[in-house]
Amino acid sequence: GVNSINWARVVAQIVYYFTATASLGMRETDFTVPTGNFGDIFAGSIARAMGLPIRRLIVATNQNDILHRALTTGEYRVGTVEPSISPSMDIQVSSNFERALYLAYGGEAAAISQLMDELKAGGFTISQGALQTLREQYLSGRVSEEETVAMIRTIRAETGEVLCPHSAVGVAVARQHVEPGVPMVTLATAHPAKFPDAVEQAIGLRPPLPPHMAALFDLPERVTRVENDNEALKSLILERRTQ
């Protein structure tokens, strides 16, 4: 897969926002995004800069809430990771947030480099000007484990849909911020079958894998070993490309 800090992945994620907004008639829309590494929601800010009528971008986090704390207090401080049922948010350094900081600081690369050095020592304070810029771009909210489980149950009861725990975090935070007359879109970031234990804990149902994925377990495995060497890897890629 492509790691979430990879720019190609961020570019691909911009499409979500255009598709969702177009389906709602290109009117002003709010988005709530389950957020760990900040890539998905950063893609939303790019979509807005491209002219999409996104009104609010809302960061949704679990108890590992460094982003929520940064946006509300201006302090970006590394804490202790608390394991949760939404593990993609179980981080303390959000790699794509550096990109948002770069824009908030007006593209001052030296300032961002200094902040990243301070982060290695435990954290830093965001300047007032940059913090104001970030707050104009993003809102945030956090939910607990109990609230996440409760939201999975609620959505199952209300709609019949089964959410993964990350998506449930997003919906829970979205409901804290929804306003009458403004569409609210929450990004569903994973299939519930990816987190069967958490879903079963919430609703007593173990979600099955989609048929096209379940069938993969019955197929033969093929493994190609390659030396830990750039040239060897390049040669293999070129060889496979021509087959």
Enumerate the predicted regions with their spans.
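PLP-dependent amino-acid enzyme catalytic core
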Residues: 1-243
